[in-house]
Amino acid sequence: ATNDNKDVFLRHAGVLALAKVGEESPRSVLQLARHGSESVRLAAVVALRRIGNSGVAMFLNDTSEKVVNEAAHAIHDEFSIPAAMPSLAGLLDVGLVSSEPVLRRAINANLRLGRPQNAMRLAKFAARETAPEAMRVEALRTLSSWPSPFKLDRVEGRFRDLGTRPVEQAHDVLDQHIGELLSSKSDAVRGATAEAISKLNYGNAAERLTRLANDNSLTAAIRASAVEALHSIDADGADEAVAAALKAESPELRATAVRILAKRNPDAGELMASLQSGLKSDHLREQQNALGVLGSLKSLEAVSLLEAQTKRLAKGTAPATLHLDILE
């Protein structure tokens, strides 16, 4: 305690000593959770991590953010301490933790545990307006991957094959929280919710998504995500939403609509008109999007438009910012 983490050699020696004690008498080390010195409690956490003792979960309730952070790392990282994982996952219920490293591990702990109640916890956390916005978005992205999690850990990048889960588990929690999520005060959360609906092919939100897609007061990113989601779930109002988005003031929204229309109805007459408008747009992204969509079409009209662009390139009249897009 008197060293107070100042001498790293003493600190390391102390950790090794505590780990040795913990192997013989874990209770002796666990009792340090009540010690008044933060440095002692930190050393206790590191020692418990070395011996893989699940009692380290006690330190998740510590008053020191450093200690809680160390405990979260101990439970989650490297080879982990599986028996303590539920305690880490449960931190999302508390509402008192604001540390991003801790919350990321708590979110991922729920993904790794993979039970229906863990999916529900992620949705509840994402719907909580007082939680950090970035972490609410992370919870939604994690929920989006629920049926088939990526094999590289979302926090560490370590290989972890979590297998597959029924997509219905994610659908069930969205049934209960979709209203809160799509009406959130956070634009980022609403956008992430729309993306989750797309990835999970969740079909019970079409009416709400249509309202988002047509709401001119919202950002283009949210409206574009809503249109994408309507297309992904093949909602009844998807074609109408795409048609409305084609006429939007936002180039981002128009570009999204053109891309979706090319997938839904590549022979639509308004598609070629929109692509021609996109090529003449003052916005680079819309021009690039139009070229990309043209490259995916096989109609004679599309080929003709592309040939016109390659001729511009050959003559040196095409903007330098579009050279690569035309060649591709």
Which stretches of residues belong to each language-model region?
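Alpha-helix N-cap/helix-start positions at coil->helix boundaries
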Residues: 7-8, 38-39, 65-69, 96-101, ...
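Amphipathic alpha-helical scaffolding segments comprising HEAT/armadillo-like alpha-solenoid repeats
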Residues: 1-2, 22-34, 51-61, 80-94, ...
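Short, intrinsically disordered, charge-balanced linker/junction segments flanking boundaries
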Residues: 1, 186, 250, 325-328
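Core register positions within helices of long alpha-helical scaffolds
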Residues: 13-20, 46-50, 74-77, 105-112, ...
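Alpha-solenoid HEAT/ARM repeat scaffold
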Residues: 8-12, 42, 69, 100-104, ...
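Primarily the internal scaffold of c-type cytochrome electron-transfer domains
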Residues: 1-15, 69, 94-109, 165, ...
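HEAT-repeat alpha-solenoid elements in large eukaryotic scaffold proteins
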Residues: 99-102, 140-160
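Extended surface/linker regions that mediate inter-domain or inter-protein docking
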Residues: 124-125, 138-145, 163-168, 173, ...
